[in-house]
Amino acid sequence: MPRYYCDYCDTYLTHDSPSVRKQHNAGYKHKANVRTYYQQFEEQQTQSLIDQRIKEHLGQAAAFQAGAPFNQHMLTFPGAVARPRLPILPTPGMPHGFPQAPGAPLMPGVRPPILPAPGIPGYPGGPPTMLQPGAPPGSMPQPGAPPGSMPQPGAPPGSMPMQMAPLPRPPTLPPPTSGVPGAPIPNSAAPPAIYQTNPPAPAGPTSGAPPAPPTAPQPAFSYAQPSEGNH
C-alpha cells in the first residue's frame, strides 16, 4: 500500500487515507513547517528588491553628480563645450593637497560644490560680457559693472571702466505740521522776527548845499487875535 509523502515536513505518512492526511495537516508541526517554507521565499524576494533599489540609487547618484545634468544638457547643442567642474573645498578631516581627479566620485563626507546660476556673464558656459561699440581694444569691464560699461575716453588699454558719480541727496524738508486750525506753529517752523531799527535820514540834494533847517512843529490850536477896530 503506497504511503503519502509530505513535502513541507519531508516525511512519509503511515497510511495514505484522507483521515490521516487531515490529521497530519492539523498538527502544529506541519503548520510550522509550512510557515517556514514560505518565509524563505519572502526573505529571498525581499533581499532581491533591496539589492535592486541599491543599484538604482547608486546609478542615480553617479548620474546626478555636481554639474553632470547641466553639462549633459549643454552638450546637446551643436558646438557646445562642457563646463569644467569647480574644485572641491577640503574638509577638516581631509589632508591638504589631496588630489581629486576630474570626474571621480565624491568622497564620503565631502559636500559637493555650489554651482552658480546658469547664464552669468563671464562664467564658462554663460554669455560673454559685451562692451559698448567704440571701446578701445583690450579694455575689460570692472567686476560687478553693468553690461555695456566702458572705460573713460582716452584711457590706456586694459583700464577699468569709469565710475559713475553718486546722485545728490534730496533736500531735507521740515516735518509737516498738524492741520488743526489755530494750532501754534513750532519755533523751528516759524519765520524769524525782523526788528527794524531807526529809518535812515533822507539824503540831501545832490547840489552839495546844506540841508534846510527843520521847521518847528505848529501847535494844534490857535488863539483869537483882537480886531483893530476896537482900539
UniProtKB/Swiss-Prot annotation:
InterPro entries: Matrin/U1-C_Znf_C2H2, Matrin/U1-like-C_Znf_C2H2, U1-CZ_Znf_C2H2, U1_snRNP-C, Znf_C2H2_sf. Belongs to the U1 small nuclear ribonucleoprotein C family. Residues 117-231 are annotated as: Disordered. Component of the spliceosomal U1 snRNP, which is essential for recognition of the pre-mRNA 5' splice-site and the subsequent assembly of the spliceosome. U1-C is directly involved in initial 5' splice-site recognition for both constitutive and regulated alternative splicing. The interaction with the 5' splice-site seems to precede base-pairing between the pre-mRNA and the U1 snRNA. Stimulates commitment or early (E) complex formation by stabilizing the base pairing of the 5' end of the U1 snRNA and the 5' splice-site region. HAMAP family: U1_C. Transmembrane segments: none annotated. This is U1 small nuclear ribonucleoprotein C-1. GO terms for molecular function: mRNA binding; pre-mRNA 5'-splice site binding; U1 snRNA binding; zinc ion binding. It is found in: Nucleus. A zinc finger (Matrin-type) spans 4-36. One of its GO terms (biological process) is mRNA 5'-splice site recognition. The keyword Isomerase does not apply. Residues 117-127, 134-159, 167-178, 199-217 have a biased composition (Pro residues). Gene3D superfamilies: Classic Zinc Finger (3.30.160.60). Keywords: Metal-binding, Nucleus, Ribonucleoprotein, RNA-binding, Zinc, Zinc-finger. GO terms for cellular component: commitment complex; U1 snRNP; U2-type prespliceosome. Residues 181-193 have a biased composition (Low complexity). U1 snRNP is composed of the 7 core Sm proteins B/B', D1, D2, D3, E, F and G that assemble in a heptameric protein ring on the Sm site of the small nuclear RNA to form the core snRNP, and at least 3 U1 snRNP-specific proteins U1-70K, U1-A and U1-C. U1-C interacts with U1 snRNA and the 5' splice-site region of the pre-mRNA. It comes from the Eukaryota. Its main location: nucleus.
